[in-house]
């Protein structure tokens, strides 16, 4: 099933069909489909060559896909996991790139959640995950047709997002 976030990408690109997207994304397992879509943009903008993508996929670096699969063999690799990989392994590249200022503001916002202690501990990880997802989509999503809207954030984080007393059921 193609969710609304991926459907919006299909709607914007006349060369992609639902079948071709489904076939390609199903081969990316255990990478979440939206993380797989964003990876193209991430590694094109930050990597100097294919070595960074290769390192992410096949080395045992902290937060790499290989290490993630060893630690969590039945989980999906989500956007917040990709964020953690970038922070730990490509921080210097990010700092020297055109996204440095925006990335720093995302980092500071995430760090401030812990320092201010305004969010109960039981919700802190979910809030951090949502901010990482929003940040990743904000920085890299436009190039691939993703916006940090409610459906995309909910789909990309697997967090049960509630707005006040209302819950959309998505």
Residue ranges and their predicted role:
Residues 4-129, 136-152, 156-167:
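C-terminal helical "lid" subdomain and adjoining coupling/linker elements of P-loop NTPases
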Residues 170:
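Short, basic alpha-helical nucleic acid-contact segments in DNA-binding proteins
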């Amino acid at each position: 099933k193609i969710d609304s976030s991926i459907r919006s990408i299909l709607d914007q690109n006349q060369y992609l069909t639902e079948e071709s997207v489904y076939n390609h994304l199903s081969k990316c397992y255990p990478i979440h489909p939206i993380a797989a879509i964003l990876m193209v943009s991430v590694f094109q903008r930050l990597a100097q060559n294919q070595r960074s993508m290769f390192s992410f996929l096949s080395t045992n670096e902290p937060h790499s896909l290989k290490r993630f699969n060893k630690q969590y063999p039945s989980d999906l690799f989500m956007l917040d996991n990709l964020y953690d990989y970038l922070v730990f392994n490509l921080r210097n590249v990010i700092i020297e790139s055109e996204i440095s200022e925006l990335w720093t503001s995302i980092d500071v916002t995430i760090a401030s959640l812990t320092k201010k202690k305004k969010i109960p501990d039981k919700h802190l990880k979910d809030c951090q995950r949502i901010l990482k997802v929003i940040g990743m989509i904000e920085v890299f999503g436009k190039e691939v047709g993703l916006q940090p809207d409610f459906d995309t954030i909910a789909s990309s984080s697997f967090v049960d997002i509630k707005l006040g007393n209302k819950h959309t059921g998505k």
